[in-house]
Amino acid sequence: YNPNPEDLKMLKNLSEEVIRNNADIGFAFDGDGDRCGYVDNNGNEIFSDIMGLLLARNFSEKYKSSKFVIDVKSTGLFGSDKILKSNDASVHYWKTGHSYIKQKTSEISALAGFERSGHYFFNKPIGRGYDDACLSAVEVCKLLDENPGSSISDLIENLPHTFNSPTMSPECPDNVKYEVIEKVIDMIEDRYKNKIKIADLEISSILTINGIRFTLEEEYD
């Protein structure tokens, strides 16, 4: 398989090794060492945005009023998390792509930037602003060390339950993909404006900085 933290074959192999060795956590590094994926102590994949949320919570306790940048594919839990809010942390959704997240993290002097593909950017005093998978793993190990009574699966279990899917990339020819995106944006914006429901739920907010992201009422995201 390709050394890709989002590759399910790679993560399955890592999961088997975590179980076989009774490990506390498994780390999946990509080929050039700037992305990291995760498997918990039970052998379950941890999506990178969820791990980013755990780290952001931990950082916000130490560095009050911190800023965090996340890509638009990330969980909506960032925007509703009570710990982040209690520590006066601010969350900024931005375009998908490691270069975009890196630039925005630097531009607004955010403490950290998390991209769902596994690129994490840490500014001082944690890091130096670039994506370093080894540093990501170190910070996760610190998180576990600072919570000696909890496994990584325990920490995740304490989060509100959400439903996630792997990154999906349907085939779309280059010469029509932007047209398709615009049509989808127009359709969702029309439903939002006219309060047309999706699965019996109204759209409560939309975000169009990179394609379109919409949130349904009752915080389904």
Question: Where are the predicted features?
Answer:
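Short glycine/threonine-rich catalytic loop with a Thr-x-Gly-x-Asp
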Residues: 5, 29-31, 45-50, 126-133
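Catalytic-loop motifs flanking and including active-site residues across diverse enzymes
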Residues: 10, 48-55, 132-136, 140
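Buried hydrophobic positions in well-ordered alpha/beta secondary-structure cores of metabolic enzymes
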Residues: 11-15, 27, 32, 56, ...
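Self-splicing inteins and homing endonuclease
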Residues: 25-26, 31-43, 105-114, 212
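Short Gly/Thr/Asp-enriched flexible loops that form oxyanion-binding sites at enzyme active sites
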Residues: 34-53, 79-81
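Short, acidic/small-residue loops that bind anionic groups at enzyme active sites
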Residues: 45-62, 95-96
